[in-house]
């Protein structure tokens, strides 16, 4: 695994006006910075900066001679502030919106000497962050690749964020129950029927759809922190590249790259 590095921003100003000290953690894969074009990878809701290598969550596409070729590119991935991968959590996560994460990453990249990104790619909230960075800094990114995401939190997402927040604060098993509910957000009734079709797990005497959901609840609880989940869930509800700006179409007029939106 690439070593986890830190970058400090002594006085970081949030969109709300609050000024805080901030330390970001990140990993670099492939070519060293300044030796090759740079690809920024933004992780998803419960992901982290470990995107490549034996335990990398995106190692199928990031690595030597893979889609994002680490023999050609410098790949950098930051941890969202508060995601807990670096054992650091946000004490006041509700002060943050996704645009703050965008600005923090941009400041860090500037201070690391990265003058341009060949690409910014991410899925879920990571893709929404790529949207935000492209609009906030339109001449900084040559290719924007948001995957399975939207440029604003829809009413469906906002409703689910509310329910997730209530589960995280009120449930006796908050991580497990929030993840079980989230799994339904990632699937449709048709996809569940196609995969399970009311089949039974005879060993557990449960429907396979039930054991699948319980498995994912337990799995997340074993590797993720509830404070990180609360922070990331809050940021999910703050997605909006048009916040304090004009319309979506106007925002795109000032964006130099052509976004390549990818749906799952």
Residue ranges and their predicted role:
Residues 1-38:
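Catalytic-loop region of hydrolases
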Residues 100-117:
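Conserved acidic catalytic loop of the alpha/beta-hydrolase fold
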Residues 140-219:
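Alpha/beta-hydrolase-fold enzymes
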Residues 231-250:
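Active-site nucleophile elbow and catalytic-triad environment of alpha/beta-hydrolase enzymes
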């Amino acid at each position: 695994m690439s070593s986890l590095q830190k970058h400090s921003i002594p006085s970081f100003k949030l969109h709300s006006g609050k000024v805080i000290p901030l330390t970001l953690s990140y990993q670099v894969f492939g070519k060293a910075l300044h030796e090759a074009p740079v690809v920024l990878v933004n992780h998803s809701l419960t992901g982290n900066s470990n995107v490549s290598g034996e335990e990398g969550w995106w190692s199928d596409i990031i690595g030597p001679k893979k889609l994002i070729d680490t023999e050609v590119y410098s790949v950098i991935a930051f941890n969202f502030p508060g995601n807990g991968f670096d054992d650091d959590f946000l004490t006041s996560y509700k002060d943050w919106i996704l645009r703050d994460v965008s600005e923090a990453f941009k400041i860090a990249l500037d201070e690391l000497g990265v003058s341009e990104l060949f690409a910014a790619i991410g899925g879920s909230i990571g893709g929404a962050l790529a949207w935000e960075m492209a609009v906030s800094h339109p001449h900084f990114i040559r290719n924007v690749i948001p995957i399975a995401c939207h440029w604003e939190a829809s009413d469906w997402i906002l409703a689910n964020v509310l329910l997730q927040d209530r589960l995280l604060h009120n449930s006796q098993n908050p991580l497990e129950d929030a993840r079980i509910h989230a799994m339904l957000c990632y699937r449709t009734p048709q996809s569940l029927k196609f995969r399970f079709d009311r089949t039974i797990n005879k060993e557990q005497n449960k429907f396979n759809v039930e054991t699948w959901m319980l498995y994912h609840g337990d799995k997340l609880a074993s590797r993720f922190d509830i404070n990180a989940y609360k922070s990331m869930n809050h940021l999910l509800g703050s997605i909006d590249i048009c916040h304090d700006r004009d319309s979506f179409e106007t925002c795109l007029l000032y964006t130099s790259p052509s976004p390549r939106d990818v749906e799952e």
